[in-house]
């Protein structure tokens, strides 16, 4: 059995897959954002619950919204502060008594799509995740291209392009990013960016679900906001496709 964890800034989801890669069980729980021991306990509890369900110990892999450090085994997870700088792989492996593999979540997503029978004929596949942050994975000839420091494909940390500034206004604040820089596109085209831009333009805070509900009802501010957001998203993604020349792109969405 294969246990695949999707660890995001908002939720952790475990999917259990059989030898035919069919999902047979899954469970979702909130992500503890500040408490590392609690995070480890949740991962351990989910693993043991899956073991009980399957009657065997499955292989464990975790997709994280960040980067594993190849030098010291720690992880860089700006959107999950509880795991930031922690030796997650070694600690969890010790707790559940088996090997644990960790990679960037967008790399995992892109690789799974690239190996789908429908897409195996494509030499290059670009996978993008829009959720709490923005992640990316680049697959060439069936293999992840991650680079020496695992930063290849971290498209969310590109800066806002000029065309996006034309849409948003040259005076749009360069939002501080968890990576330490300002103006990274993940702070504008992610779920939290979607909410932040609404509050910036209308001086009123609403959750994304309410904004979308207002948009569906034809409320003018919400309609203008969603259209502005989609224009910025199109500019950012268009630049990526131009740079990579990728014949196939796949998106994973969790903005609302």
From Swiss-Prot:
<dbReference type="GO" id="GO:0009254">
    <property type="term" value="P:peptidoglycan turnover"/>
</dbReference>
<keyword id="KW-0119">Carbohydrate metabolism</keyword>
<keyword id="KW-0862">Zinc</keyword>
<dbReference type="GO" id="GO:0005524">
    <property type="term" value="F:ATP binding"/>
</dbReference>
<protein>
    <recommendedName>
        <fullName>N-acetyl-D-glucosamine kinase</fullName>
        <ecNumber>2.7.1.59</ecNumber>
    </recommendedName>
</protein>
<keyword id="KW-0418">Kinase</keyword>
<feature type="binding site">
    <location>
        <position position="184"/>
    </location>
    <ligand>
        <name>Zn(2+)</name>
    </ligand>
</feature>
<dbReference type="Pfam" id="PF00480">
    <property type="entry name" value="ROK"/>
</dbReference>
<comment type="similarity">
    <text>Belongs to the ROK (NagC/XylR) family. NagK subfamily.</text>
</comment>
<feature type="binding site">
    <location>
        <begin position="4"/>
        <end position="11"/>
    </location>
    <ligand>
        <name>ATP</name>
    </ligand>
</feature>
<comment type="pathway">
    <text>Cell wall biogenesis; peptidoglycan recycling.</text>
</comment>
<comment type="function">
    <text>Catalyzes the phosphorylation of N-acetyl-D-glucosamine (GlcNAc) derived from cell-wall degradation, yielding GlcNAc-6-P.</text>
</comment>
<dbReference type="InterPro" id="IPR000600">
    <property type="entry name" value="ROK"/>
</dbReference>
<keyword id="KW-0067">ATP-binding</keyword>
<feature type="binding site">
    <location>
        <position position="179"/>
    </location>
    <ligand>
        <name>Zn(2+)</name>
    </ligand>
</feature>
<keyword id="KW-0808">Transferase</keyword>
<dbReference type="GO" id="GO:0045127">
    <property type="term" value="F:N-acetylglucosamine kinase activity"/>
</dbReference>
<feature type="binding site">
    <location>
        <position position="177"/>
    </location>
    <ligand>
        <name>Zn(2+)</name>
    </ligand>
</feature>
<keyword id="KW-0547">Nucleotide-binding</keyword>
<dbReference type="GO" id="GO:0046872">
    <property type="term" value="F:metal ion binding"/>
</dbReference>
<dbReference type="InterPro" id="IPR049874">
    <property type="entry name" value="ROK_cs"/>
</dbReference>
<keyword id="KW-0479">Metal-binding</keyword>
<feature type="binding site">
    <location>
        <begin position="133"/>
        <end position="140"/>
    </location>
    <ligand>
        <name>ATP</name>
    </ligand>
</feature>
<dbReference type="InterPro" id="IPR043129">
    <property type="entry name" value="ATPase_NBD"/>
</dbReference>
<feature type="binding site">
    <location>
        <position position="157"/>
    </location>
    <ligand>
        <name>Zn(2+)</name>
    </ligand>
</feature>
């Amino acid at each position: 059995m294969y246990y695949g964890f999707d660890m995001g800034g908002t939720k952790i989801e475990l999917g259990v897959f059989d030898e035919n890669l069919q999902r047979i069980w899954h469970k979702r729980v909130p992500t503890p954002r500040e408490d590392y021991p609690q995070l480890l306990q949740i991962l351990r509890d989910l693993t043991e619950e899956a073991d009980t369900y399957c009657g065997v110990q499955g292989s464990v892999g975790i997709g994280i919204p960040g980067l594993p450090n190849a030098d010291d085994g720690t992880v860089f997870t700006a959107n999950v502060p509880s795991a930031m700088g922690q030796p997650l792989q070694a600690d969890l492996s010790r707790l559940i008594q088996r090997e644990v593999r960790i990679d960037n979540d967008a790399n995992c997503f892109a690789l799974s799509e690239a190996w789908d029978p429908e897409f195996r004929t494509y030499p290059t596949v670009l996978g993008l995740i829009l959720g709490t942050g923005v992640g990316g994975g680049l697959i060439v000839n069936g293999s992840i291209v991650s680079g020496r420091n695992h930063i290849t494909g971290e498209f969310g940390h590109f800066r806002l392009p000029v065309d996006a500034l034309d849409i948003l206004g040259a005076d749009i604040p360069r939002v501080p990013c968890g990576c330490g820089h300002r103006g990274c596109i993940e702070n504008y085209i992610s779920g939290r960016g979607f909410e932040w831009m609404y509050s910036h333009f209308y001086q009123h805070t609403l959750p994304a679900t309410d904004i979308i509900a207002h948009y569906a009802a034809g409320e003018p501010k919400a309609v203008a906001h969603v259209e502005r957001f989609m224009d910025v998203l199109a500019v950012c993604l268009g630049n990526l496709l131009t740079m990579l020349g990728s014949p196939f792109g796949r998106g994973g969405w969790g903005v609302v």
